Amino acid sequence: MIEPLASIFRTNNYDIKPVLATLFKSEHFYDVLNQGCLIKSPVDKVISCLREFGVVFPDSVSQYSDAYAMWNYIRNWLASMNQDPGDPPDVSGWPAYYQAPQFHEIWINSDTLPKRNQFTDTMITNGYTRNGKKIVINAVGFTQTLSNPADPNALIDDALAILYRVPLSVTAKQTIKEQILLTNQTQDYYWTNAWNGYIANPSDQASFNTVNTRLKSLYQYLMNLSEYQLS
């Protein structure tokens, strides 16, 4: 990959854009051997969580004060996980990028792992509120973007395809489905009926609470598993 990309770089008068376009469209970039092999940095974990779930921030132009305050809230979380953007520990950057033999494993220790989980727990439950504006994961809204939310099997598969870089076993997915979406039942219709009931009458608070509670539990559980720490 190095030599062909270098050739593209020279051919395009040292414009980096064609190089990146070629790399991001290459088979090598999507090689399964490159997936799930690194622990996410705090920035990777936090920003990917916000983007994958489509968390909405206040407008940075019309509501810049609230927007900047919420960005700073996120920055504080990153700093607590030992990666404060723009403030590396020294000129070498963060040790996880160069310190052998641990490298990326440095990101997780007895202090940072609980904080990584606390962040996702916070975002899927109460979020963060300032001046009446909130950043929080909309569990129902995210689920509505999936291909077939009424089918608990498809729902879990679609969610995992977005959130995970490594596959879960069939047994693990079945257990998650039965314990969370089916509330310890065994038939899929326990979830299907609940979801369809909400879709038929989205203004009904009881129907919303039923699906929202289960979905929050599902996503919180998935984000607390070790597989979610991998990129």
What are these regions (language model features)?
Residues 1-12, 18-231:
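Flexible, low-complexity segments enriched for small/polar residues
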